[in-house]
Amino acid sequence: MSNNPHPQDDGSQLYDNFEISPPSIVIRKADTDQSLNKIMLNQESQDINNYYTENVKNDNNPNNSYQDYTFSGNSSNQQHQQQQQQHLYEDLPTQFHYSNNSFFEPPPAPTVELTDDPLPNFNYPPSNIYINDNASDISLNTKDLPQFTTNEFLSPTSQLSTPFSPGHYSQSSQDFLQVNHTNGSGNNNNNNNNNNLLNPRSPSQYSSHSLYSDNSSQPASPFLDAASHVSNNSFIPPVIPTALSDVGSQNLDPSHNLGLSANQHFDSVNEFLSTGEIQLGQSVSSTNLPSMEEDSIKWGGGNGQEAYTSLAMMEQRASADNSGMRLATHQFSETQIKQEDQQTNMNHQYTFSNPQMNFDFDITVTPPPQQLEVKPFGNDKDMNNSSGTTNNNNNNSQFDIVSTAATNNSNQLLTENNLSNYNQLQRTEQGNDNDSLQIHRDATGIIISINQAPEEIAAKTPSLFSNSSANSSIHNSPRSDIDNKSGQYYNNGGDGNSLVPNSQLLPSSPNSNNDNYGGGGSSNDENNLLNPEEFQSVKRGRRKSHASRTSTNPNSLSPRSRSRSRSSAKSSNDAVISDNDESDDVLQSREKMLELALPSSSSKRTQKHPSLYACHLCDKRFTRPYNLKSHIRTHTQEKPFICSKCGKSFARSHDKKRHELLHQGIKNFKCEGYLQDGTRWGCGKSFARADALRRHFQTEAGKQCVKRLLLEEQANSSGKPLATSSGVEIT
């Protein structure tokens, strides 16, 4: 700024305003991206404002020009300033217009041209940084770190570097912990110092670790763990310390060294590792337990020999290797030996003892029972007669084995085929020596004990299929009749729970021989079998027995009984009313519809035929062998009949047939029929089962369907009202 307090003319005042030393900057154009120098921008702001005021004055005077300005004062100084100002005007941008109609804009901010990069260079490291690209040679450089002597620290500093590091120096014997062995004269053995050093790059020769394994050679030692590199055996010869003793104690008995020489080590002797013995200070582990049994069998007693302990065996081996070292073997007293022999002979007990720890480790093995001799079944008398007294002495220790399909495989289910041979499995016979009863077992030695049903309970038990009730007497059973006779039906001893053929219980025909009923089977079995024609005649006779009685005295029976007497085309009355066993094959007829609509009288009927067939596994009895066979399958869970559509299994064939009709969509039972005058009745609904149609007749809609049929039956029965299945009388 100008320091002249007196104002001058316009021309001189303009240059006085620029009386300042020019800054050492270079004016860049507006499109440059250099940083601003804020200090110099603030310094020139006042001069620019003064220049703007003079420029306005010059615009008002059109005769003035920049070339007409005259300078006053020091001509040399003003001339120098004028040249600098002219040079400044030449470098001004084009937006500075000194015309009347131009608007003044300030010049761009001055910038400083940088010659050096102010940011540090990260491309190249400094020379004092050591970098090695070899991954295997990565180490800690300790050249510039303070060094410590081995007297101050146990771990030498040379262990922290590798031979490739710059600060590496050769290892010396003073950098390591030395193990000095004192000989008998008391002098140190300095010749073996190099061999006794703890080498950090390899496992120590006295370490508890192996070179190829992370597991310790003493896996169950209480003083070592799997990650320990400190050896308890770092003594020459190595000493196995006893339990609860100081680790590394040198005041141990030399007899505990197990006969190892000074150049041998516990890890290098594979014989001790394979013996499986429990060392002193160790416990039972998975590494030594499998071989303990082998050593106990090899060295232990059982045949009158003395049982060697694990320590005694190791001492004997050590004494065999070192002749100069005599180890005493622990001897037991005579009483202890006798007791151990008795226990060994009785319980096969193997004892592992440690005399220093005063404890015994016993393992008791219970052997399986000795298998007795097998006597063939069916040849008892022949063997007893031929062998004489030899077999008589062994009769009490032998078992009779019956090889059947039911007992050869314990997982096999009971079936009706092997149930017929069940009496042979429990057959008993008289002994030769003491007349005692011997139980005959199967090959597995397992007896299936099933309590037989008493006769009294079986007689009072109602049948599941044949409507047997308390009216059935014990005398109706063929078992009592057979027992009263000679008892020759059962060839195996007279057990009455076997399936008896139908021909033995009832005569198959009027021409059948009655002598065969109690004789003993002299005739062929084919003659005693029931023929299919005769069986069908028996069924028809049972169905017509009631109809024949109604024909003799029709007035003594109810109208419902007379309607049932005219039923000659039905297949099975019991199947429809009680269990529906044969209802699928029944034709739709007038009598069938009446039976379904009228209430059943099964509770009022008495059993006409005896329950001849009893179940072996429960108290139930049946009048037909088919019903018994189907019932036994409920015990054995046997379902041999399989549906061809869905694979569902059934115990009875007619159940499978009825189920297959559901897949086919066949419904044989319809709610429809014709009256005697030809009028149709019913709603026409179809049902797959007869019991479903009977339930339909019990509904309100079903009562209306069957009402006309019941009215017609009432008219035919001399005007007496009929009671429907719901208990309502038809009037």
From Swiss-Prot:
Residues 78-87, 187-217, 384-397, 465-477, 497-516 have a biased composition (Low complexity). It is found in: Cytoplasm; Nucleus. Residues 54-77 have a biased composition (Polar residues). Disruption phenotype: Leads to hypersensitivity to ion stress. GO terms for cellular component: cytoplasm; nucleus. SUPFAM superfamilies: beta-beta-alpha zinc fingers (SSF57667). Keywords: Cytoplasm, DNA-binding, Metal-binding, Nucleus, Phosphoprotein, Repeat, Transcription, Transcription regulation, Zinc, Zinc-finger. GO terms for biological process: bipolar cellular bud site selection; calcium-mediated signaling; cellular response to acidic pH; cellular response to calcium ion; cellular response to mechanical stimulus; cellular response to starvation; cellular stress response to acid chemical; filamentous growth. Pfam families: zf-C2H2. Probably phosphorylated in a calcineurin-dependent manner. GO terms for molecular function: DNA-binding transcription activator activity, RNA polymerase II-specific; DNA-binding transcription factor activity; RNA polymerase II cis-regulatory region sequence-specific DNA binding; zinc ion binding. A zinc finger (C2H2-type) spans 613-635, 641-663, 669-700. It comes from the Eukaryota. Induction: Expression is higher in white cells than opaque cells. Induced during exposure to the weak acid stress of acetic acid, through the regulation by the transcription factor MNL1. SMART domains: ZnF_C2H2. Its main location: cytoplasm. Residues 54-87, 178-225, 364-398, 465-587 are annotated as: Disordered. Transcription factor involved in the regulation of calcium ion homeostasis and required for the maintenance of membrane integrity. Binds to the calcineurin-dependent response element. Plays a role in azole tolerance. PANTHER family: PROTEIN ESCARGOT (PTHR24388:SF54), ZINC FINGER PROTEIN (PTHR24388). This is Transcriptional regulator CRZ1.
